């Protein structure tokens, strides 16, 4: 999982004597003569410029930005719950686009999942899988009007969860109810 991946990366960073700048937020790229020369940050609310030979934007996506979700995924996505971190707000992508970078890849798609309607707006990363509701192949899914809107048995869950998660967004109140009989146990 992500937490263990970060732990191993931090060990490598420390072993190589690289400084980690905590309590910092990147605000802009330092861009001169068609070259990214560094990054502007807010460090404990104080603006600083950090110059570097190279800059890597390892900053995540935009899933936690309602505005960017709506712009790239379409109407209705501003209200979607996020199964990941609340910190992926697209700031790094916005900085890159601002200096002329081209968006690459599929910005109009995402891995949406059935998510607990009473769960938090953003998942607790230590228990993120607890909020995902992906047992639909063993029951039926209906919307708030009592209508089925997906074929729960279309394929294995691994091949349908993102597609079905997107379908929930299109439903009244963005709700899908999973219904099971007494034979299904979790």
Stretches found by the model and what they are:
Residues 1-47, 65-68, 114-118:
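Conserved redox-cofactor binding core of oxidoreductases
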Residues 38, 49-51, 150:
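A sequence-level detector of short linear motifs
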Residues 13, 19, 31-33, 47-50, ...:
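Solvent-exposed alpha-helices and their adjacent loops that cap or buttress functional pockets
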